[in-house]
A protein has these predicted regions:
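Outer-membrane beta-barrel "beta-signal"
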Residues: 200, 225-239
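Gram-negative outer-membrane beta-barrel proteins
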Residues: 39-45, 64, 73-77, 88, ...
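Repeated loop/turn-to-beta-strand initiation elements of outer-membrane beta-barrel proteins
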Residues: 60-66, 89-96, 126-132, 167-176, ...
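Outer-membrane beta-barrel architecture
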Residues: 55-57, 81-83, 117-121, 161-167, ...
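Transmembrane beta-barrel strands of outer-membrane/channel proteins
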Residues: 35-41, 67-71, 96-102, 118, ...
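Detector for outer-membrane/organellar transmembrane beta-barrel domains
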Residues: 111-183
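Residues that define the transmembrane beta-barrel architecture of outer-membrane proteins
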Residues: 29-31, 46-52, 74-78, 102, ...
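Short glycine/proline- and aromatic-enriched beta-strand/turn motifs that initiate or cap beta-hairpins
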Residues: 19-73, 238
Length: 239
């Protein structure tokens, strides 16, 4: 991941040297509303729970924002994400991304996560694109049973991700993501998460998709510990 991230940064810097090829803002905005249903399975493949989520996003290519929440039995998640990355030579985007996440387990604990750092994307504008990010990661947790003695627990950490997206035909997108976090799950570095997914666009305003999310605990500093997977079905509306 470090080598790929470095290569992307090197090429983006070369393009950045030509200021005429930089676009700082696109006025056209694409808004989407996505609703999903997720089934979580444990490492023995037994189903643990189901969850529903909804997310709104606004994308102007260089400037994007999205926010959503996820509900499970006794668990609530909220995430907001913003990114600004000027377009360089039509193919590269380099900028800053920030993420804010709140997770509450009813009567057990709550936590707040904040990530901010460098974001890179390369898009061929035809069939393939790759994006990557490296972030400072701040986590703050409050355990209700000991809150009178230890009000808060803090941690300063690191987060990374890389995603490949392939569009073999016009309306079909396939993607793979390897990261230390997901949109609603933020573990300390490095508990890898591998996501495989696809989305088919039936019309200009609606598409359906499916994702398989395989989760591990501490794959690299200890022996790999498979922690289960999530299977998510979603519908996306564009307007």
């Amino acid at each position: 991941m470090k080598k790929i991230f470095g290569i992307l940064l090197f090429f983006a810097f070369n393009f950045f040297c030509d200021a005429q090829n930089i676009n700082f803002f696109t006025s056209k905005i694409e808004k989407t509303l996505t609703g999903g249903l997720t089934f979580r399975h444990l490492s023995d493949f037994s189903m643990e729970n189901a969850a529903a989520d909804i997310c709104f996003s606004a994308d102007m290519k260089e400037l994007s924002f999205n926010s959503g929440f996820k509900l499970r039995s006794g668990i609530f998640d909220f995430t907001a994400q913003a990114c600004y990355a000027p377009t360089i030579a039509r193919h590269f985007n380099v900028g800053i991304m920030s993420i804010f996440h709140v997770n509450v387990y009813s009567d057990i604990f709550s936590e707040i996560d904040f990530l901010t750092g460098l974001y890179l994307k390369y898009d061929t504008l035809k069939h393939f694109k790759i994006s990557s990010g490296i972030f400072y990661f701040y986590k703050e947790a409050r355990i209700f049973s000991i809150a009178d003695k230890i009000p808060r627990i803090y941690n300063h950490n690191l987060a990374k991700y890389i995603e490949f997206c392939f569009t073999p035909i016009q309306n079909l997108s396939l993607y793979m993501n390897l990261a230390s976090y997901t949109y609603y799950r933020y573990t300390l570095y490095f508990s890898p998460d591998l996501k495989l997914g696809g989305e088919y666009r039936f019309s200009d305003w609606v598409s359906l998709g499916n994702e398989w999310d395989f989760q591990y605990i501490d794959m690299f500093t200890l022996s790999a510990n498979y922690n289960g997977f999530e299977n998510r079905f979603f519908v996306k509306l564009r307007f």
